């Protein structure tokens, strides 16, 4: 019985630290994802919660969930994102960057 009590106390003491670490990681992913899309995509797309895209046919990233399931974009980002549009360059991102981009895209969607 004493072992169970000690285990519960240790778990309860560790839980806030784990939540803080998780929150910091999520925040870091959002910041990195925002930086990546700003660098690679903002010359044509609106990449934030507001604003118009600079290229008239480039969708604002905050509206992507109206066309696509955001998580479904992971494979395209990792294997090479390309469209039939001649102005759209092909991009390939590393796995960690893909996760950060997806996290950022999810955070800005108009819902």
Residue ranges, per PLM feature:
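Short cysteine/histidine-rich zinc-coordinating motifs and their immediately flanking basic loops
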Residues: 53-58
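Protein kinase-like catalytic domain
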Residues: 45, 106-109
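Electrostatic cytochrome c docking/interface patches
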Residues: 17-36
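N-terminal secretory signal peptides that target proteins for export/translocation
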Residues: 1-3
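Bacterial N-terminal signal peptides
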Residues: 5-17
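Extracytoplasmic electron-transfer domains, predominantly the class I c-type cytochrome c fold
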Residues: 60-106
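Short, non-ligating residues that shape and space the ligands of small metal-coordination modules
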Residues: 50-51, 70
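The canonical Cys-X-X-Cys-His
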Residues: 33, 38-47, 101
């Amino acid at each position: 019985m004493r072992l169970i009590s000690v285990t519960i106390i240790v778990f309860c003491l560790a839980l806030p630290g784990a939540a803080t670490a998780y929150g910091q990681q999520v925040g870091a992913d959002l910041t990195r994802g925002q930086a990546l899309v700003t660098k690679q995509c903002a010359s044509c797309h609106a990449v934030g919660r507001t604003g118009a895209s600079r290229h008239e046919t480039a969708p604002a990233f905050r509206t992507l969930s109206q066309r696509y399931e955001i998580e479904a974009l992971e494979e395209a980002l990792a294997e090479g994102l390309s469209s039939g549009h001649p102005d759209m360059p092909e991009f390939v991102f590393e796995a960690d960057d893909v996760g950060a981009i997806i996290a950022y895209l999810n955070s800005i969607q108009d819902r």
